[in-house]
Amino acid sequence: MPTKAGTKSTANKKTTKGSSKSGSPRGHTGKTHAPPSMHSGMLYKDMVNIARSKGIPIYQNGTRLTKSELEKKIRRSK
């Protein structure tokens, strides 16, 4: 009797572990979760749009401003 119970409990443990791990092969690819762009509050696109609407130039001496530079300018113009 005790041997049967013992094998049962170990078998149950194994199956629960296995199913949770191998049951979802796509679990840790990051595709199921929201894309990283969703996590950053303001996207570069949004920054450019705000800058345009406020009349802040996006380009400076031939190169495009970085997100942080745009952010600074937008904050200053507020």
UniProtKB/Swiss-Prot annotation:
Induction: Expressed in the early phase of the viral replicative cycle. Residues 1-24 have a biased composition (Low complexity). Its main location: virion. It is found in: Virion. Signal peptide: none annotated. Residues 1-41 are annotated as: Disordered. One of its GO terms (molecular function) is DNA binding. GO terms for cellular component: virion component. Keywords: DNA-binding, Late protein, Virion. Belongs to the asfivirus P10 family. May play a role in genome packaging through direct interaction with viral DNA. Binds to ssDNA and dsDNA with the same apparent affinity in vitro. This is Structural DNA-binding protein p10. It comes from African swine fever virus (isolate Tick/South Africa/Pretoriuskop Pr4/1996) (ASFV).
